[in-house]
Each structure stands twice: as structure tokens, then as C-alpha cells.
């Protein structure tokens, strides 16, 4: 069994918060695949289904973000799962909006929901070696702005990339069930248009890079390169005078 936990805060007032992007991903997976109805258990909303032959349990902890580990730990003990069977989906300030990264293990990175889960995973074999799916929401720019930023709603302008990201995660979730994390990340990147790009989102054709003109030189350097070498006589009175003047020896 694979347990996919989306993190967030319960209640309609938090539904569209940046901090709730994990809930949004879980909801989209639920909508696009065949799952049982949501039910309340393990201090969470849960739904079970089968994806690519693997039984999957969706979990949305209702404990509030900072106590997410209580709910997830309870569900894992009930089903006798290990951290290798767990994928946690949550918001990441240090990734630009629309970026996705998956890794196994690591630290909480200042995320209180992950801190709670890490604490509860210490009692399981394998400890904190569960898979973490980080969904980029961007950073407000200053530490003192973070609290209001993560608990603020996504802007309308975010809907285009947000809908695309949620759909791509849900459509390719079978790769998670098969533990094909790198292929999953590549598929999401393609869906988000993250192919060959320069900073600022400008796509670059590798063939164009190969044909790029050489770097321009300053007009002074060009003049020096084009300057003809002086015609210095090799023999005669002038040559003898220059040898004495420049100290040139035969």
C-alpha cells in the first residue's frame, strides 16, 4: 500500500491558502482516479483506491498543519506501513511557483508540518526516509512576511500554473506508485513548460546556442587587431641606427 498525504489546514477559510497546496493536490488525485468517498478516520479525511495495481490511501490530516504527524503516524501504525510507503505533498517557499521536487529523507526546511511528521516517524523502522513532494509557492522576500504569505490565498493570476500543476500531478500519480520519481519529475516539468529555458522563462533552442555569434569586442581591441605592423628595415643605415637606439643585438 502507498499512503499519499497532502498537508494543509482544515476549514473553508484556509481552502485556497498557499499553505494548503498539499490538500489541493490530494483532492485532484481523488477527482481523477477511482477512490472511495472521503471518510473521517485517524484524525483525517481518508479515501482508498487502486492506482496501477497498487492500493493507495489518500490522507488529509485534520489536526492543523503543525500536528500533521499525529494523523499520519496513526494511519501508518494501523496499516503496518513503513516510511518507504509514505509520500507527503506540501508547499515549499524555496521553490519558484510551479516547480516540483521529490526526494527521500532530509530535513524539514522550516516546515512545521514536516517537523511534526519527522518526530512521529522516529518510532518507525527507516525513520525519516519517506518521500517528500515539495510544490513551489515562491517566497515573499522577507522572513517577517512568510506567515501571512503562506496563510494568504493564491492570486487569480496563479490559477493557470496552479491548475496545470495539480492536473499533471494527478495524471501521473501512477509513477509514484511505481516509485519512478525521476520520471515523474520529468513529466511534471514538461507539463509546466520547463524544457530548455533561460532565467525569466525564455525558452532557448540548443541549436541556436551553437550558432550564436562570437562575443562582440570593443572598438579599441578591434582597432589594435586590425592595425598593420610597422615596416622595420632589416639592413642599411636606418637599421643600424634603430639597433643602437633599441639596444638590439645581432
Swiss-Prot record:
Under Gene Ontology molecular function, one entry of this record is:
peptidyl-tRNA hydrolase activity
Catalysed reactions, semicolon-separated: an N-acyl-L-alpha-aminoacyl-tRNA + H2O = an N-acyl-L-amino acid + a tRNA + H(+)
Q: Which residues form the active site?
A: 19 (proton acceptor)
Q: Which GO terms describe its cellular component?
A: cytoplasm
Superkingdom is Bacteria
- The catalytic activity of this protein is classed by the Enzyme Commission as 3.1.1.29
Q: Where is this region: Disordered?
A: 192-250
Sorted alphabetically, which keywords does the UniProt record give? Cytoplasm, Hydrolase, RNA-binding, tRNA-binding
PROSITE patterns annotated for this entry?
Answer: PEPT_TRNA_HYDROL_1, PEPT_TRNA_HYDROL_2
The record's top EC class is hydrolase
BP GO terms, sorted: protein quality control for misfolded or incompletely synthesized proteins; rescue of stalled ribosome
Annotated site residue numbers, Discriminates between blocked and unblocked aminoacyl-tRNA = 9
Composition bias, kind Polar residues: at what positions? 219-229
Basic and acidic residues compositional bias, start-end: 241-250
Q: Where can this protein be found?
A: Cytoplasm
What family, per the record?
Answer: Belongs to the PTH family.
Q: Which PANTHER family match?
A: PEPTIDYL-TRNA HYDROLASE (PTHR17224:SF1)
The family database entries (NCBIfam families) matched by this protein are listed as:
pth
The UniProt subunit note reads as follows: Monomer.
HAMAP family hit by this protein: Pept_tRNA_hydro_bact
Q: State the name under which the record lists this protein.
A: Peptidyl-tRNA hydrolase
Q: Which gene encodes it?
A: pth
Amino acid at each position: 500500500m502507498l499512503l499519499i498525504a497532502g498537508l494543509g489546514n482544515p476549514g473553508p477559510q484556509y481552502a485556497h491558502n498557499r499553505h494548503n497546496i498539499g490538500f489541493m493536490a490530494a483532492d485532484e488525485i481523488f477527482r481523477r482516479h477511482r477512490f472511495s468517498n472521503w471518510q473521517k478516520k485517524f484524525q483525517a479525511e481518508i479515501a482508498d483506491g487502486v492506482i496501477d495495481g497498487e492500493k493507495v490511501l489518500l490522507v488529509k490530516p485534520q489536526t492543523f498543519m503543525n500536528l500533521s504527524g499525529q494523523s499520519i503516524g496513526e494511519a501508518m501504525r494501523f496499516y503496518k506501513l513503513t516510511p518507504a510507503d509514505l509520500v507527503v505533498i506540501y508547499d515549499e517557499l524555496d521553490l519558484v511557483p510551479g516547480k516540483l521536487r521529490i526526494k527521500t529523507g532530509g530535513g524539514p526546511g522550516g516546515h512545521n508540518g514536516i517537523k511534526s511528521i519527522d518526530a512521529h516517524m522516529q518510532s518507525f523502522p527507516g525513520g525519516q526516509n519517506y518521500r517528500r513532494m515539495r510544490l513551489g509557492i515562491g517566497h515573499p522576500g522577507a522572513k517577517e512576511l512568510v506567515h501571512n504569505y503562506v496563510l494568504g490565498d493564491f492570486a487569480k493570476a496563479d490559477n493557470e500554473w496552479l491548475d496545470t500543476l495539480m492536473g499533471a500531478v494527478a495524471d501521473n500519480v501512477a509513477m509514484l506508485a511505481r516509485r519512478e520519481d525521476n520520471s515523474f519529475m520529468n513529466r511534471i516539468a514538461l507539463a509546466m513548460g520547463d524544457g530548455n529555458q533561460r532565467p525569466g522563462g525564455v525558452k532557448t533552442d540548443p541549436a541556436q546556442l551553437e550558432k550564436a555569434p562570437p562575443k562582440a569586442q570593443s572598438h579599441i581591441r578591434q582597432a589594435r587587431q586590425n592595425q598593420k605592423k610597422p615596416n622595420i628595415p632589416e639592413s642599411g643605415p636606418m637599421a643600424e641606427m634603430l639597433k643602437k637606439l633599441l639596444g638590439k643585438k645581432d
